[in-house]
Amino acid sequence: MGYDPELKYSLPYTWGTVGILYNTTLVDEPIDEWSDLWDAKYTDEILMQDSVRDAFMVALKLLGYSSNSTNEAELQEAKEALIQQKPIVQAYVVDQVRDKMISGEAAIGVIYSGEALYTQYENPDLEYVVPKEGSNVWQDSWVIPKNAKHVENAEKFLDFLCRPDIAVMNFEYITYSIPNTTAIEMLDEEMQNSEVAFPNLENYELEVYQYLGEDMDTLYSNLWKQVKSH
């Protein structure tokens, strides 16, 4: 990751992608594009993420732009696309996407890959796809603050998390992808080859969200408010 390319200050914990989860019994053909979320035949069956960067990523990728765009004209265009989509969206959600998709309350939802993997355990009719227009790839990491009072204990905790057996237990509990290669080799072959849990990133057009500065944060937030209040 750009913030710590040599991993001198942080320890990778989990990672994943953002994509589309869909119920194969509720859609008439496979979903593989963000544009499918603008299809009126899925009115009131679509769940969008209630998150400014995730929502704008979807619209920006739909339009062929970077998810880290700082071009105001592109962002205005993305805002208009989200407003155009809004009448066919069932809800803007975060954690609720998981339960709604499992129960069949919605047919299509924008979701994080770790959540998607969990839903597939609960409902085998659910499929996850990273849209062909591109998406987001992310990584969560641990850091020890420079003013930490118990550095030794923090290091022991991180060493514990890095144990392959613990990493496997953690993965099986939270269902988010792990970067521990030794632990991955301890998983069954089907999971090791899962394109949901451990995709070959070279097969996808993916970007990491960048911090765009306070001015851009304000612009994104204001545009998102316009979408939500429309």
List each language-model region with its residue ranges:
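Conserved C-terminal helix/tail region of periplasmic/extracytoplasmic solute-binding proteins
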Residues: 202-230
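A bilobed periplasmic-binding-protein/Venus flytrap-type ligand-binding module shared by bacterial periplasmic
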Residues: 17-26, 61-62, 138-150, 169
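Periplasmic-binding protein-like
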Residues: 75-84, 122-146
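Extracytoplasmic ligand-binding site segments that recognize negatively charged/polar headgroups
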Residues: 1-105
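Short, hydrophobic alpha-helical packing/hinge segments within bilobed ligand-binding/sensory domains
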Residues: 34, 97-100, 116, 154, ...
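Ligand-binding "clamshell"
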Residues: 4-7, 118-130, 192-194
